[in-house]
């Protein structure tokens, strides 16, 4: 069964490359058997990024004579956001087609058309759907098998609603998969187009059992948020599945660039309102990140008396609350007195805004749990130090990547609030643990209000103010050259891109 799931994932890997950089894929395949060391390095770097653009350096081309087109291959070359917005304003009936998360925008004469994913990528989605059905026939879990069949149908229609409901309803499955176009990280033009991502997962029952404390209080944290009552959805944030998984195979959006250690899905606000979301924590990826990246960076950049505070348990708690917090806050924006999609309202900067909201509301939630006596207040130093060490790791990506954009903004805000200070003599950073809760609460209020109002201008101005890498931090990060930027997963299943 796992082999069939991986086979389906390899088909979606082939689709992701065509969403990201079809020309880069041609070069990747051409270099596959080249013996030269330079060719091998280029081949491997193409694999890391799923394109000829460095996803962690603002899509900077790393191949000669290449130019990055915003939105990757999801839009026509040379198109601008203004051109799309002007076209839709003149042709309002085309808005749903052009702005759909599941269409590739193309030119047709003087018009713009949205080609459905299931049409554009049909030659890979058909075999992927077959492999999912084959896997379903091999599963002894009836609910999981039913989900796989529904997801196979969804691949061929771009309608994921029914299969998403079935996925959220899975009860402690031994095996699970993420298998859909969910995230919009490739779309830095409109911020609405999704890319395919896959994770084949095996449940870690012991670690999953530890999540019960967090699950119990999700609704209470939602009620406690610094947000007007009418902007708090009635069901979003209520207890939903939370699983710790090991992922022996990932592809597509989950394979290239930033290596996620957790996910909170689906992103469909209808599912949020009806069911909530499922939170997945990739234990094998988290272990690698913390041990090989986060802890070493903390020891280099944090003041010596705080450098040993970040921990695996602290980082896990921060990540758990981050993923829970993706499902907290407003499900829609209020724009001109009407309900509007938050992604569409905020635009391309939405991904960074949402990652920041999840970070900060997550810390706010940890404060709430400590203040209510659910978690010991003695853990506060551990939680804050683990998050700040994580910031240092993330901003090494450059501030164009969504998570890095979010955490660069957080860092600068905390510095402004004196919750983080720098020792000019040593160049190391320290946390003022007395000031951090207030800074977290005020930032949570700002980010939640931006999402609730759908105020794109306010969002862009906020990130412009706080989104620049300070020179002193850039200098400090130069000392971390021997620490990996991220983990580079190696799978025994192979890539097998077609």
Model-predicted regions and their roles:
Residues 10-14, 140, 144, 156, ...:
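Residue-level signal for secondary-structure boundary elements
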Residues 1-139, 143-147:
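N-terminal helix-rich structural modules
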Residues 80-81, 204, 262, 376, ...:
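Helix N-terminus capping/helix-initiation residues
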Residues 4, 87-352, 356-368, 373-391, ...:
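Fold-level signature of zinc-dependent metallopeptidase catalytic domains
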Residues 9-11, 21, 35-38, 69-72, ...:
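Serine/threonine-rich low-complexity intrinsically disordered regions
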Residues 444-498:
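Extended, compositionally biased alpha-helical segments that mediate assembly or anchoring
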Residues 363-460:
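Long, well-structured alpha-helical subdomains associated
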Residues 7, 82-90, 212, 216-219, ...:
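Polar/charged alpha-helical tracts
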């Amino acid at each position: 069964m796992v082999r069939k799931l991986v086979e389906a994932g390899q088909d979606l890997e082939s689709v992701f490359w065509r969403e990201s950089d079809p020309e880069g894929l041609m070069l990747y395949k051409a270099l596959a058997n080249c013996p030269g060391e330079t060719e091998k390095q280029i081949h491997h770097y193409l694999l890391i990024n799923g394109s000829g653009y460095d996803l962690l350096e603002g899509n900077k081309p790393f191949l000669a004579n290449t130019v990055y087109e915003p939105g990757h291959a999801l839009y026509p070359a040379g198109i601008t956001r203004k051109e799309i917005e002007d076209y839709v304003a003149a042709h309002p009936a085309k808005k749903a087609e052009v702005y759909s998360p599941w269409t590739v925008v193309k030119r047709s004469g003087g018009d713009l058309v949205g080609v459905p994913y299931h049409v554009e990528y049909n030659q890979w989605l058909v075999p992927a759907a077959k492999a999912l059905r084959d896997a379903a026939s091999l599963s002894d879990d009836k609910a999981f098998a039913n989900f796989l069949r529904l997801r196979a149908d969804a691949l061929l229609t771009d309608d994921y609603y029914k299969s998403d409901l079935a996925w959220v309803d899975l009860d402690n499955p031994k095996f699970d998969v993420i298998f859909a176009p969910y995230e919009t990280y490739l779309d830095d033009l409109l911020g609405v187009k999704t890319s395919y991502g896959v994770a084949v997962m095996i449940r870690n029952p012991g670690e999953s059992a530890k999540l019960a404390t967090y699950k119990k209080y999700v609704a209470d944290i939602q009620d406690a948020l610094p947000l007007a009552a009418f902007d708090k959805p009635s069901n979003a944030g209520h207890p939903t599945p939370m699983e710790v998984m090991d992922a022996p195979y990932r592809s597509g959006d989950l394979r290239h660039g930033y290596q996620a250690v957790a996910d909170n899905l689906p992103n469909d606000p209808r599912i949020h309102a009806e069911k909530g979301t499922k939170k997945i924590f990739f234990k094998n990826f988290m272990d690698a990140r913390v041990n090989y990246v986060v802890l070493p960076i903390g020891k280099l950049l944090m003041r010596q008396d705080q450098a040993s505070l970040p921990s695996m348990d602290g980082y896990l708690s921060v990540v758990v609350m981050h993923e829970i917090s993706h499902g907290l806050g407003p499900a829609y924006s209020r724009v001109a007195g009407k309900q509007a999609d938050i992604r569409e309202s905020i635009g391309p900067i939405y991904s960074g805004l949402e990652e920041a909201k999840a970070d900060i509301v997550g810390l706010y939630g940890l404060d709430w749990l400590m203040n209510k006596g659910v978690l010991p207040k003695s853990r506060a130093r551990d939680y804050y130090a683990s998050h700040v060490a994580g910031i240092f790791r993330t901003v090494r990506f450059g501030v164009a990547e969504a998570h890095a954009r979010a955490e660069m903004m957080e860092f600068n805000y905390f510095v402004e609030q004196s919750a983080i200070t720098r020792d000019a003599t040593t160049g190391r950073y320290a946390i003022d643990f007395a000031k951090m809760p207030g800074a977290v609460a005020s930032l949570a209020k700002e980010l939640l209000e931006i999402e609730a109002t759908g105020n794109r201008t306010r969002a862009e101005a906020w990130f412009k103010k706080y989104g620049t890498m300070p020179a002193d931090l850039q200098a400090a990060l130069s000392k971390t050259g021997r620490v990996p930027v991220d983990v580079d997963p190696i799978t025994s299943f192979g890539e097998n891109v077609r």
